Curated annotation (Swiss-Prot):
Family: Belongs to the UPF0665 family.
An individual GO BP term: cytoplasmic translational elongation
Name this polypeptide is given: UPF0665 family protein C23C4.06c
Pfam annotation, one family: Methyltransf_16
Keywords: Cytoplasm, Nucleus
Record PANTHER family: HEPATOCELLULAR CARCINOMA-ASSOCIATED ANTIGEN, RIBOSOMAL LYSINE N-METHYLTRANSFERASE 5
Cited CDD domains: AdoMet_MTases
One GO CC term, this protein: protein-containing complex
Taxonomic placement: Eukaryota, Fungi, Dikarya, Ascomycota, Taphrinomycotina
């Protein structure tokens, strides 16, 4: 299983005539950290949608663009009347429905992308959206939306382990089923965009979910909470928690579950993360770790925590998931 992400790299507009608007769209298809380009030839459908009415998606311009395998970028220009007031771009593979197929986890899955809505002749968007369908699969609105930074940077993007772990949580796989009793407490460490915590809160409305990260991630996380509030029951919070420092009093409580995905990319933080886990966990806490192998030093972290944690369950693959408890 390999994930690739269509990423909008640049938007450039010009008014060709008083009534005609042209928008240049430059995009790429890469892995989550941008280190590998999509290796297959493909056709990407680039569409401009009229979003004047919030629930309508009327295509006003479209182009099919050839992507050359292992390429760096591709581009096209869309033309449409300048009279449209709310425009949204969507990019997806030509053989892929822009909503439905984005949620299937198959080999070489390419995730579509949506821009934020914008008005022609105004400031162009610098954020985009990703879509994860919910468990009911009844309609295109049955799902979760996650904001990302436009471009090909590492920060403020969904990473593979979070996408896979969220899909596991939203599925019927009993290994990833949490207790449905009232007021279970779930803590997420290194929440990033919030995909895992929001997925848990949407599936378990009786749970109390606390997402945490450093200060610079909180605003982004809260935007995703706001976007998905209709899928939750006001049962989620976002807070600053710095690993290795004194744990604030509000976190000194029993946690039924602690979850984290793709947090083992920085070896210098391993000792602080382990120290925080030792302080936050008790005998009845289950710890879920989802990660994509990137460095051999991840084995060192796992070896250290297995000195005081028991391995309850392990799922190996491109994304490895561990479930652990205190000895």
């Amino acid at each position: 299983m390999t994930f690739y992400y269509i990423r909008i790299l640049r938007l450039q507009e010009k008014l060709e005539e008083s009534f005609k608007y042209a928008l240049r769209v430059v995009f790429t298809i890469t892995s989550d950290l941008g280190e590998v380009s999509y290796p297959q030839d493909a056709t990407v459908r680039v569409e401009a949608l009229d979003r004047q009415q919030s629930h309508s998606r009327i295509t006003i311009s479209k182009q099919c663009v050839s992507w050359i395998g292992n390429g760096h970028a591709a581009e096209t220009t869309l033309y449409f009347p300048a009279s449209h007031q709310q425009i949204q771009l969507t990019l997806h593979l030509e053989n892929q429905n822009s909503i439905v197929d984005s949620i299937h986890i198959n080999a070489d899955t390419v995730l579509p992308v949506w821009s934020e809505a914008f008005s022609p002749k105004s400031t162009l968007p610098n954020m985009v959206w990703r879509y994860i369908q919910g468990p009911e699969k009844k309609s295109p609105n049955d799902g979760l939306w996650f904001l990302e930074q436009m471009g090909n940077s590492i920060a403020k993007h969904l990473w593979d382990a979070g996408v896979v772990f969220s899909k596991k949580i939203l599925s019927d796989d009993w290994h990833y089923s949490f207790s449905n009793r009232k007021d279970i407490n779930v803590l997420e460490l290194g929440s990033g965009c919030g995909i895992v915590g929001i997925s848990i809160a949407s599936k378990y409305p009786r749970a109390l979910v606390s997402m945490t990260d450093t200060e610079d991630a909180i605003e982004f996380m809260e935007k995703n909470v706001e976007k998905n509030k209709s899928a939750m029951s006001n049962n989620i919070t976002s807070d600053i928690l710095v690993w290795g420092h004194d744990i604030p009093r509000k976190f000194r409580r029993h946690w039924d579950y602690i979850v984290m995905s793709d947090v083992m990319y920085n070896e210098s933080s391993f000792s602080d993360l382990e120290a925080s886990l030792q302080e936050l966990m008790d005998k009845n806490t289950k710890l879920y770790i989802a990660y994509k192998k990137r460095h051999d030093n991840e084995k060192t972290f796992m070896s250290n925590i297995l000195g005081w944690l028991d391995l309850v369950y392990e799922e190996r693959g491109p994304i490895t998931i561990y479930i652990l408890q205190k000895k």
